[in-house]
């Protein structure tokens, strides 16, 4: 008799996705981050659901409700810090996952890649709105500054901002709608993840060499299920260390002060995972130009399939582009550092140079390096 997992309509889908899925035999630990992101999403949805049971989205009580969760709810402090630091883990895994895709040429799976970029935007939007909910100083002013950027859109900008605010400033209406969107978006993200996997399983996984691996496939279970479990254990150990020993390490002390529209914090800055984009935004003196650069800093990922000039897919055998890739990584770390610094000399010029080099490496130097490497390898 055929196994039920191969015949049952529901189990069959799970079987083809996680059990009998043919996977390349040589995928490294860099391929673990997809499953880790799935675990992160589950952690965020579960902890978020329990937080939503006790949270009130009203300007008068939002801050106190978060305090109440931490003080009075059973293990409320754990749920709250798991959710806050879980977001950081989510972004660490996201950046590594995208970086892996860039290094090994996974962007040639265009549907999978583009849905991945849309997912990145959706997760960033969700995280931004989640940061507003505790209604601390940085929540309020972060929301004010970032939503205000839309006023740079010609003609409709101011109207659009007031429409998003639901009034003439960030207030109760804004907080309520941000809570509503923050609640619904993770479920939209889950649906997008399923589509992301659907397109991935149409082509099969890439591998470190970038070569076709159809002739050398192994079943996902038990090989990669065990490998993924190891990754999950390591990630949870790291997350729990963060939550139980350094819960406020990545947060801003200003957010422990209730929101006050009459008092602006000295340095308004987002969470660490947005700092690179914030640095790019600030490096352009023009408001509309800054907003466009901010959007393009992520949108540029969608151009990667068209900027690929080499006949080799992966960077495994391409030392020149490899060097450029690691310069790009260092450059992003510099941008992250600059995003957290005040707008003064020498940080302004460093930020501008780092922003120019970010776009130059991706749009100019990497495609040229691909052509040079092809000529050196005498492919013609």
Swiss-Prot record:
GO annotation, biological process: mitochondrial electron transport, ubiquinol to cytochrome c
Chain positions recorded as heme b b566 binding sites? 97, 196
Q: Which cofactor does it need?
A: heme b
- Keyword field: Electron transport, Heme, Iron, Membrane, Metal-binding, Mitochondrion, Mitochondrion inner membrane, Respiratory chain, Transmembrane, Transmembrane helix, Transport, Ubiquinone
Where in or outside the cell it occurs: the entry states: Mitochondrion inner membrane
| Coarse class of the protein's main subcellular location | mitochondrion
Query: What are the transmembrane regions?
Result: 33-53, 77-98, 113-133, 178-198, 226-246, 288-308, 320-340, 347-367
PANTHER family attached to this UniProt entry: CYTOCHROME B
Q: What is this protein called?
A: Cytochrome b
Q: Which organism is it from?
A: Hylomyscus alleni (Allen's wood mouse)
